[in-house]
């Protein structure tokens, strides 16, 4: 095979993430690859809240069509955007190394989160982030903003927000780590399920799958599978009020989860053998549901 074609979203971050995979393929196999850029439904409807246009697969379905039509050998996704049930024609061939999983605060004026004024306006499009911000500071005014990193930074200025909350992973991959004012403790301010992880999706038994299988990161796979099992048991998606944190502790896996039940955020944790990662995620969800 002379060249691999990898489908991805058009955003700068999606392209940078795909270039990370392309670089790894070049390093391991000395094989060239190129991007096939796709505009997804989630990208087209920037003026509508994600939970109003249906969460599952908004950033994935159009890219999967390119795989079905044999226009690309693989697709690179942020795993937090991938529904817990992948259509039978496809597989998540590899979950690669995980970037910083934390959420961060970017201040409009270099004021730390703990020092922002009473009634400060903070921008986020995530109901998970909004709810956890309110738990930390009930006085905050949450302003919904969507778009890529650059768009949100622009909206922060235009709408005179006191700050915005974003994922550390995207900022670091874009080389914008210097914008971060504060990091939230992921055990207190839980990230999205699979935050910071990249997944490579292929058709089952695809000709090029062997190349992508070589990029699997074992530890990232364990934690992401556990978190996705947790989300599946709750029948949620990346736009539900669900958060998860997981870490490998020797032979064990420690997990924390949050979920909204009737307007109340329920938080539980669990510890167990890491080889039972999928069952652990399921049990954590059952523990939360009571």
From Swiss-Prot:
Cofactor note: Binds 1 dipyrromethane group covalently.
SUPFAM superfamilies in alphabetical order: Periplasmic binding protein-like II, Porphobilinogen deaminase (hydroxymethylbilane synthase), C-terminal domain
Functional pathway: Porphyrin-containing compound metabolism; protoporphyrin-IX biosynthesis; coproporphyrinogen-III from 5-aminolevulinate: step 2/4
Cofactor(s) the record lists: dipyrromethane
One annotated GO molecular function: hydroxymethylbilane synthase activity
Entry GO CC: cytoplasm
Gene Ontology terms describing biological process: protoporphyrinogen IX biosynthetic process
EC number: 2.5.1.61
Record's catalysed reaction(s): 4 porphobilinogen + H2O = hydroxymethylbilane + 4 NH4(+)
One Pfam assignment: Porphobil_deam
Positions of modified residues (S-(dipyrrolylmethanemethyl)cysteine): 238
Top-level lineage group: Bacteria
InterPro entries assigned: HemC, Porphobilin_deaminase_cofac_BS, Porphobilin_deaminase_N, Porphobilinogen_deaminase_C, Porphobilinogen_deaminase_C_sf
Keyword Membrane annotated: no
Keywords associated with the record: Porphyrin biosynthesis, Transferase
Family statement: Belongs to the HMBS family.
Annotated function: Tetrapolymerization of the monopyrrole PBG into the hydroxymethylbilane pre-uroporphyrinogen in several discrete steps.
Additional notes on this entry: The porphobilinogen subunits are added to the dipyrromethane group.
Quaternary state and interactors: Monomer.
Protein name from the UniProt record: Porphobilinogen deaminase
Organism for this UniProt entry: Clostridium botulinum (strain Alaska E43 / Type E3)
